[in-house]
C-alpha cells in the first residue's frame, strides 16, 4: 500500500489543460496501491460526479476539490479596463497628495505610467479547496457557482477573501503551485506579503491549511519549497507534497503540449508559446521521492518532504468517507396534468394530437405510418428515461414565451 496519494490532479475537465481521463487515472491510482485520490480541476466541479463514481467502483476514496482562481477583490476585477485605470489614478493621487488639476496637461499614456504600481493585479492566483465533509462540498459548489456568476474575468470565475469567509466551513485549503497567491510572493521575494496571506488563510481554515511543495526540477520551485518549509515552522502549518498532475503517463507530455497549443491558439513550433516542463505525470511514491532527491536539499529538508508526502494521508483521513456527490432523488419538478392522466400519458396524448394535426394541415396523412413509427420510438425513449415532465415544462415555457412574442428555434438538440 502506498504511503502517498495525489491530491492535486487535473482531469480532462480542466478544459484544454488537463489530459487525465478519469477512469484511466483512477485505475492508475489502484495499480500504484493508492487508496485515495483527489480531483482539483481549474475553476470547475464538472468532473466530480464521474470521478466519484469511478473511485468508488475501484474501492478508492475520492477527495472532491477544485483549484480556484483567487483575486484580491471580486468587485474590482469585473470592472472595465478604463474603470480600473481610473481607480489606479485616484489611488496615485491619494498616495502622492496631489490633485487631478496638477496633471491636466498630462497625456493618458503618461498618467498610466505614473500610476502603474497602483493598477489592479488581474492575475488569477491558484488555491486548492477540498471538501472535508458534506457541508464543505455544498459550500464548494456554492463558492464556484458564485465565482462564475459575479466574478468572471478572462473566461474564469474568481474568488476573494470575502467569498472564502462566506464559504470556508468544511473546506481544506492547500497553497497549490508556484502560481498561488502565497507561492507567487515567495517566488518574487515578497516574503512578508506571503506571510500576510498565510496568516489570513490560517485564520480562515485553521488546521485545515497546508503549504504545498512539489518535487519539480525548477530552480524557482526548489526555492519556494525551501521557503515554504521555513514558513511551515514559523506558522505551525502542515506541509503537503503534490506534483500537479496534468496527464496520466510520462509519455503523454507531447499530447498535453498539443492540448495547450489548442487552448492558447498557438502553433507547436512557436518558441514563445505556453509550455510546461515534462514533469506533470501521475508519479508513483518512489518517483515522488526520486524527483525530490535530485535537488540540493538538506537532511532536515528531506525529512520534511517525507513528512509532507505522509500528510497526504493525514489530509485524506480527515475527509469524511461518505460525502454524497449528486442528489438522492430526482430534482426535476413535476408538472400538473388534467385528472385521469399522469405525465407520461398526458405527454403522449399531446404529441399524438399534435402529430395528426400536422399531418392533416400539411396533406401528409398518406405518409402517417412513417411519422407514427418515429413518434412511437421517440416517446418510448423519453418515457423510459423519465423525461416526460421535462418535455412538458419545455412545452409550457415555449407556449408562454410565444404568447409574449419571443422567437424559438427548431430545438433539434
Residue ranges of predicted features:
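Domain-core and long-helix interface of multi-subunit machines
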Residues: 2-39, 43-58, 93-103, 110, ...
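Non-catalytic structural connector segments
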Residues: 2-3, 68, 81-82, 182, ...
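Short active-site oxyanion
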Residues: 35-37, 126-127, 236, 405-408
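A residue-level signal for conserved active-site and pocket-lining positions in enzyme catalytic cores
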Residues: 41, 62, 133, 140, ...
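Phosphate/diphosphate-binding loops
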Residues: 61-64, 74-76, 113-114, 118, ...
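A short acidic-Thr-Gly-centered motif at the start of a beta-strand
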Residues: 119-120, 230-236, 397-404
Amino acid at each position: 500500500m502506498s504511503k502517498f496519494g495525489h491530491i492535486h490532479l487535473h482531469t480532462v475537465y480542466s478544459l484544454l489543460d488537463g489530459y487525465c481521463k478519469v477512469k484511466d487515472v483512477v485505475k492508475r491510482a489502484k495499480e500504484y496501491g493508492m487508496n485515495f485520490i483527489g480531483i482539483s480541476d481549474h475553476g470547475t466541479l464538472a468532473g466530480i460526479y464521474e470521478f466519484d463514481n469511478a473511485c468508488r467502483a475501484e474501492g478508492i476514496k475520492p477527495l472532491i476539490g477544485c483549484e480556484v482562481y483567487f483575486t484580491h477583490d471580486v468587485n474590482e476585477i469585473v470592472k472595465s479596463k478604463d474603470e480600473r485605470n481610473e481607480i489606479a489614478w485616484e489611488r496615485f493621487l491619494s498616495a502622492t497628495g496631489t490633485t487631478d488639476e496638477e496633471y491636466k496637461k498630462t497625456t493618458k499614456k503618461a498618467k498610466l505610467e505614473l500610476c502603474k504600481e497602483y493598477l489592479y493585479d488581474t492575475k488569477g492566483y491558484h488555491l486548492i479547496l477540498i471538501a472535508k465533509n458534506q457541508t464543505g462540498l455544498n459550500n464548494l459548489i456554492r463558492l464556484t457557482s458564485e465565482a462564475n456568476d459575479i466574478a468572471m474575468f478572462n473566461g474564469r470565475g474568481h474568488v476573494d477573501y470575502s467569498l472564502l469567509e462566506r464559504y470556508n466551513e468544511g473546506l481544506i485549503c492547500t497553497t497549490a503551485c508556484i502560481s498561488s497567491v502565497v507561492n507567487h510572493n515567495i517566488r518574487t521575494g515578497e516574503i512578508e506579503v506571503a506571510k500576510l496571506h498565510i496568516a489570513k488563510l490560517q485564520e480562515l481554515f485553521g488546521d485545515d491549511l497546508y503549504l504545498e511543495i512539489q518535487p519539480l526540477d525548477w530552480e524557482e520551485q526548489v526555492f519556494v519549497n525551501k521557503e515554504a518549509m521555513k514558513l511551515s515552522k514559523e506558522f505551525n502549518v502542515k506541509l503537503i507534497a503534490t506534483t500537479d498532475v496534468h496527464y496520466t503517463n510520462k509519455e503523454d507530455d507531447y499530447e498535453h503540449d498539443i492540448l495547450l497549443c489548442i487552448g492558447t491558439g498557438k502553433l507547436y513550433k512557436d518558441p514563445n508559446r505556453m509550455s510546461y516542463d515534462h514533469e506533470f505525470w501521475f508519479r508513483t511514491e518512489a518517483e515522488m521521492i526520486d524527483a525530490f532527491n535530485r535537488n540540493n536539499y538538506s537532511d532536515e529538508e528531506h525529512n520534511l518532504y517525507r513528512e509532507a508526502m505522509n500528510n497526504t494521508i493525514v489530509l485524506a483521513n480527515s475527509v469524511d468517507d461518505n460525502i454524497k456527490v449528486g442528489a438522492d432523488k430526482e430534482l426535476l419538478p413535476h408538472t400538473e396534468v388534467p385528472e385521469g392522466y399522469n405525465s407520461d400519458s398526458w405527454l403522449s396524448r399531446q404529441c399524438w394530437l399534435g402529430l395528426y394535426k400536422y399531418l392533416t394541415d400539411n396533406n401528409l396523412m398518406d405518409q402517417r405510418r412513417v411519422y407514427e413509427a418515429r413518434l412511437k420510438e421517440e416517446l418510448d425513449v423519453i418515457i423510459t428515461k423519465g423525461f416526460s415532465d421535462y418535455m412538458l415544462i419545455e412545452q409550457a415555457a415555449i407556449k408562454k414565451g410565444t404568447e409574449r412574442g419571443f422567437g424559438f428555434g427548431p430545438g433539434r438538440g
